[in-house]
C-alpha cells in the first residue's frame, strides 16, 4: 500500500457518501441509459479432496441485466431466491458493483484517467437458475456478475485485468474456490498468496456430471463452523495425494475406477455429515455402486461424476426428495452476452 492510498481511500469514501445523497449524485448515468447482460455459471468447489482449492464450472446459469439509470436502485428477481432477495442497496450485486466502481476509480486516479464516481442509479433484472444455499456457488455467481458488469460499464473498466478481478472477487467472497471457476470456466486450481488469489485453469476430459439438489438449504457459515481446527497428519497427507490424483483424473479422463479413488476425502465431508445426513447417505450409496460422488461445496447438493442415463438406471438407489440436474462442464466462465440492447460497445 503506497503512502497516498489511505488518503485517496478516505476521499473516495467521502465522495461515495455525498453521491448517494438525494440530488447530489455525480457518477455515470447522466447520458443515455447503458446496460449489459451478464451470464454467470454455477460452480462446484472442493470436489472431494480439493478443499478450498479445486472448482468446476457447470452449465447452469444466472442471468442479470445491469443498467445505469438516472436515480435510485430498482431490482427485479425471478427464479431461485426471489422470495428472500434484497431489493435495494443491500443486494449483493449492487454492493459488488459499487465496490468495483471504487476500485476502478482508484486505478483511474493512479493513471491517466479520471474517476467516474458512483452510478447515479442502478437497475437489476435477475433471472436466477442456480439454487441458493445448496453448494453450487450462487453467491460467487452474484459477486462475479457485479464485477463483470462494472468492468463493462465503467469508463475505465479495461484497467482491471482478470487477475485483479480474481483478487477482488476472492477478497469479497473470502476464498477463491468458487469465484475462480465462475470467472474462468472449466476446472480451476486456486490458491492465495500474500499478494492475493491466483488460479490455473484446465480443460477437463470429464465433461458430464449430475447434481442432486435437495429442498433443504445449508448456510456456508454453518458448514464451516463444523470443521475442526486441526486434523490428523495422516488425513492431511491422504487428501494431498487424492487431490493431486483428482486433477489428473479429471484432466485426462482416467475413468471411474481412478476417479472413485481420487474423490476420497478426509478433511471436511465427514465432519459436515451431521448437518446433512441425507446428502452423506446418498454419497455413500452412489459410491458403493461405483459412481464417483462428493458433496458439492459446503453442501447439501451431491455431485456425481456420471451421466444422466446411468443415474436413471439407479433411481431406486438415489431415492426420493432430490432434484436431478444433468450438467456439462462449462468451458466458458462469466461473460457479457453480446448483442444485447443498451450494451456499451
Question: What residue ranges belong to the model's regions?
Answer:
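ATP-binding N-lobe of GHMP and related small-molecule kinases
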Residues: 2-5, 9, 15-134, 152, ...
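Short beta-strand segments
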Residues: 39-41, 57, 182-185, 191, ...
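DPxDG-like acidic metal-binding loop motif
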Residues: 60, 136-162, 183-185
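Alpha/beta catalytic cores of group-transfer enzymes, especially the acyltransferase/condensing modules
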Residues: 160-207, 280, 285-286, 293-295, ...
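Short beta-strand-to-loop capping motifs
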Residues: 192, 214, 304-308
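Active-site rim beta-loop-alpha module in soluble metabolic enzymes
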Residues: 211-274
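Glycine-rich, charge-dense phosphate/pyrophosphate-binding loop(s)
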Residues: 250-345
Amino acid at each position: 500500500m503506497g503512502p497516498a492510498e489511505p488518503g485517496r481511500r478516505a476521499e473516495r469514501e467521502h465522495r461515495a457518501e455525498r453521491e448517494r445523497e438525494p440530488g447530489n449524485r455525480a457518477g455515470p448515468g447522466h447520458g443515455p441509459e447503458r446496460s449489459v447482460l451478464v451470464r454467470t455459471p454455477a460452480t462446484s468447489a472442493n470436489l472431494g479432496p480439493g478443499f478450498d482449492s479445486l472448482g468446476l464450472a457447470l452449465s447452469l446459469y444466472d442471468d442479470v441485466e445491469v443498467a445505469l439509470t438516472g436515480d435510485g436502485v430498482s431490482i427485479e428477481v425471478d427464479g431461485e431466491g426471489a422470495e428472500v432477495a434484497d431489493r435495494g442497496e443491500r443486494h449483493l450485486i449492487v454492493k459488488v458493483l459499487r465496490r468495483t466502481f471504487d476500485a476502478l476509480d482508484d486505478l483511474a486516479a493512479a493513471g491517466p484517467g479520471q474517476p467516474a464516481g458512483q452510478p447515479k442509479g442502478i437497475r437489476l433484472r435477475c433471472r436466477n437458475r442456480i439454487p441458493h444455499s445448496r453448494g453450487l456457488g450462487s453467491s460467487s455467481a452474484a459477486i462475479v456478475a457485479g464485477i463483470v458488469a462494472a468492468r463493462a460499464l465503467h469508463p475505465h473498466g479495461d484497467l482491471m485485468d482478470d487477475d485483479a478481478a480474481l483478487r477482488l472477487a476472492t477478497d469479497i467472497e473470502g476464498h477463491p474456490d468458487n469465484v475462480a471457476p465462475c470467472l474462468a470456466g472449466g476446472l480451476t486450481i486456486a490458491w492465495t498468496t500474500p499478494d492475493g488469489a491466483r488460479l490455473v485453469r484446465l480443460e477437463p476430459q470429464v465433461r458430464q456430471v449430475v447434481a442432486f439438489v435437495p429442498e433443504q438449504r445449508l448456510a456456508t457459515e454453518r458448514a464451516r463452523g463444523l470443521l475442526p481446527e486441526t486434523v490428523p497428519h495422516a488425513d492431511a497427507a491422504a487428501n494431498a495425494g487424492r487431490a493431486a490424483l483428482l486433477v489428473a483424473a479429471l484432466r485426462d479422463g482416467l475413468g471411474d475406477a481412478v476417479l472413485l479413488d481420487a474423490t476420497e476425502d478426509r478433511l471436511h465431508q465427514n465432519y459436515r455429515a451431521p448437518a446433512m445426513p441425507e446428502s452423506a447417505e446418498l454419497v455413500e450409496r452412489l459410491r458403493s455402486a461405483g459412481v464417483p460422488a462428493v458433496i458439492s461445496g459446503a453442501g447439501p447438493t451431491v455431485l456425481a461424476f456420471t451421466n444422466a442415463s446411468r443415474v436413471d438406471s439407479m433411481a431406486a438407489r438415489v431415492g426420493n426428495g432430490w432434484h436431478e440436474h444433468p450438467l456439462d462442464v462449462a468451458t466458458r466462465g462469466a461473460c457479457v452476452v453480446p448483442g444485447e440492447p443498451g450494451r456499451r460497445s
